[in-house]
Amino acid sequence: MGKYFGTDGVRGVANSELTPELAFKVGRFGGYVLTKDKQRPKVLIGRDTRISGHMLEGALVAGLLSIGAEVMRLGVISTPGVSYLTKAMDAEAGVMISASHNPVQDNGIKFFGGDGFKLSDEQEAEIERLMDEPEDKLPRPTGADLGLVNDYFEGVQKYLQFLKQTADEDFTGIHVALDCAHGATSSIATHLFADLDADVSTMGTSPNGLNINDGVGSTHPEALSAFVKEKNADIGLAFDGDGDRLIAVDEKGNIVDGDQIMYICAKYLKSEGRLKDDTVVSTVMSNLGFYKALEKEEIKSVQTAVGDRYVVEAMKKDGYNVGGEQSGHLIFLDYNTTGDGLLSAIMLVNTLKASGKTLSELADEMKKFPQLLVNVKVTDKYKVEENAKVKAVISEVEKEMNGDGRILVRPSGTEPLVRVMAEARTKELCDEYVTKIVDVVRTEMGAE
């Protein structure tokens, strides 16, 4: 974690923490670090539907033009759309303006290298070092060497064509309900599934700049649950504001999370001989039931720290092709370089159609342990990792569990929160364990 970069780029309240001035510097210095060996480097910029997107885009573009870049504005597009197009169009870098699932007042900036992958910790550290130098010593081209900016709104269609090619077959006879969170997938998801011959019902597809993630999308799947039952759909697919997450809903209205989707898809891909080394990469937040279900299918697992970037790093390092998070960041590395909600949706519907089963039948093969996650708002989230009393209560609870459950306490990567999570055999035990730890965290960490 750096001064500006969190686990998923630079984030903050737009025009307060993430100001146009900061966005200009991020564009100028970030663009330089990623493109310094190139004359007239090509950089793609996309954004979600937040009202602050235009403001930050203008500042970012100015920063990139000041180092002589050729900027191509993609308009409203998902984060994985930017990632895919950056690589497909041989650009030197891609930039996405979004705060993902966060509320509308927040926004963020994340970079992709020319290979379509997110930046390494070392690259982010170099950008931060240059931003904090007392004097800006970067080149300042003038005249014909200044950067250029063009619109490339056709990029969304190029990404749509790519997605359609990942479907194993058409989706005739499947009724899909979509919730696009009034976000970046609003203009593309309906076309995608209609073009694949699914019957489509939609909600959350009317962005107005202020309603992104507001009671809809992957962080509010209960809205889609009701919609699926109302429309008698076979499956519900909920995306977040920037389209890099997927949470599903079965035909009965039950929520199917990222762990379950990973398990369902991994089992199918293994049966097809397409799961590399019969291994799935997940984070420490994945449910114990997920690992037990994988073991039953003789699928191995690798665990990483929380954050899809760490999942991707592990996948790249050892050549695995399926990974993700319980939160719905799912990575299918044979097709794209980052979490992709629309791609994940296609993989899941592929599996659903090939199986001949309902989604509830597929999801029920994985028995989840009861899990409770409580977020505690604190003044300094990082102190939790060294606090002696917090450590002591965690140790006490783990002894009580006696190996039949687990505890996870960690600072959020993107918000001023400490996350306290417990898994146990019963919901009552989860409540008891989490309450005991949260009480100590609140007392010790200066909870707001």
UniProtKB/Swiss-Prot annotation:
Domain of life the protein comes from: Bacteria
InterPro entries reported in the protein's UniProt record: A-D-PHexomutase_a/b/a-I, A-D-PHexomutase_a/b/a-I/II/III, A-D-PHexomutase_a/b/a-II, A-D-PHexomutase_a/b/a-III, A-D-PHexomutase_C, A-D-PHexomutase_C_sf, A-D-PHexomutase_CS, Alpha-D-phosphohexomutase_SF
Reported modifications of this chain: Activated by phosphorylation.
The record's free-text note on cofactor binding: Binds 1 Mg(2+) ion per subunit.
One GO CC term on file: cytosol
BP-aspect Gene Ontology terms: carbohydrate metabolic process; peptidoglycan biosynthetic process; UDP-N-acetylglucosamine biosynthetic process
Gene3D superfamilies, per the entry: Alpha-D-Glucose-1,6-Bisphosphate, subunit A, domain 3, Alpha-D-phosphohexomutase, C-terminal domain
GO MF, one example: phosphoglucosamine mutase activity
Cofactor: Mg(2+)
Annotated catalysed reactions: alpha-D-glucosamine 1-phosphate = D-glucosamine 6-phosphate
Residues found modified as Phosphoserine: 100
EC number of this enzyme: 5.4.2.10
Residues given in the record as Mg(2+) binding sites: 100, 240, 242, 244
Active-site feature positions: 100 (phosphoserine intermediate)
Keywords, alphabetical: Isomerase, Magnesium, Metal-binding, Phosphoprotein
Family affiliation: Belongs to the phosphohexose mutase family.
NCBIfam families: glmM (TIGR01455), PRK10887.1 (NF008139)
Primary role: Catalyzes the conversion of glucosamine-6-phosphate to glucosamine-1-phosphate.
Protein name: Phosphoglucosamine mutase
Species per Swiss-Prot/TrEMBL record: Bacillus velezensis (strain DSM 23117 / BGSC 10A6 / LMG 26770 / FZB42) (Bacillus amyloliquefaciens subsp. plantarum)
